[in-house]
């Protein structure tokens, strides 16, 4: 129904709680992963690598970290499908339909983007077990105006109103969320592309950016990483923050 303009978007929200469907994303992920022999988190574990995805459980009002919290949804961690987890983690409220999943007790969980509760969960990789000599480094966009588009003005329709709410919330979280030590180990990338009057801030929910805009963001990231590596002082970071990290928890 999202193909029928504002009315279609409003109807999609009314009947499915989201403007766009994410089933295509799950199918695309399956097509990308299956040739590599990866279907579940267990398959990833066998490669010696780890993957964590965060999901907001609106039913229980809590953050889930998959695959560890898979039992909350009635499945074993090693058997949880990666493509399904990606779909859940990508379902930004209002923009995309939530994923519904019934657990072993018959309770239906409404699951959306983990960024609703923790938009920068770099702490997930600080599990307190591996004790790597260096911390996990993160990349995040920060800077510019809170949104790359005009805000909600006049008398917007229901869909545009709710989209503006979610875009603003997500962008503000992007700019403000950081726990002890996270800021110092984060490579902050400017989301501003172009110069002068042509400058534009790419927001978290700008899904239709061009290839040129994508390349500009990539170039911003490369420059930010080079600057970070020139000034990074691990000894100083460890002295100031290592003992303050609450490994794998918030």
Predicted feature locations:
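Patatin-like phospholipase
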Residues: 1-250
């Amino acid at each position: 129904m999202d193909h029928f303009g504002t009315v279609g978007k409003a109807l999609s929200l009314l009947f499915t709680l989201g403007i766009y469907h994410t089933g295509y994303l799950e199918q695309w992920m399956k097509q990308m992963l299956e040739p590599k022999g990866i279907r579940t988190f267990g398959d990833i574990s066998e490669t010696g690598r780890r993957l964590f995805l965060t999901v907001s459980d609106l039913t229980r009002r809590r953050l889930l970290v998959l695959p560890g919290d898979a039992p909350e949804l009635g499945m074993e961690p090693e058997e949880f499908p990666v493509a399904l987890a990606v779909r859940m983690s990508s379902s930004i409220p209002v923009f995309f339909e939530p994923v519904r999943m019934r657990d072993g007790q018959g309770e239906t969980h409404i699951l959306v983007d983990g960024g609703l509760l923790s938009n920068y969960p770099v702490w997930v990789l600080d599990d307190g077990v591996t004790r790597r000599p260096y911390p996990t480094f993160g990349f995040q966009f920060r800077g510019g105006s809170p949104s790359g588009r005009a805000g909600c003005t006049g008398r917007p329709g229901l869909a545009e109103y709710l989209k503006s709410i979610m875009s603003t919330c997500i962008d503000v979280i992007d700019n403000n969320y950081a726990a002890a030590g996270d800021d110092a180990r984060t490579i902050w990338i400017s989301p501003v592309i172009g110069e002068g009057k042509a400058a534009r801030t790419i927001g978290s929910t700008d899904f239709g950016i061009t290839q040129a805009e994508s390349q500009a963001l990539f170039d911003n990231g490369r420059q930010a990483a080079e600057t970070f590596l020139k000034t990074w002082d691990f000894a100083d970071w460890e002295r100031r923050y290592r003992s303050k990290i609450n490994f794998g928890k918030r």
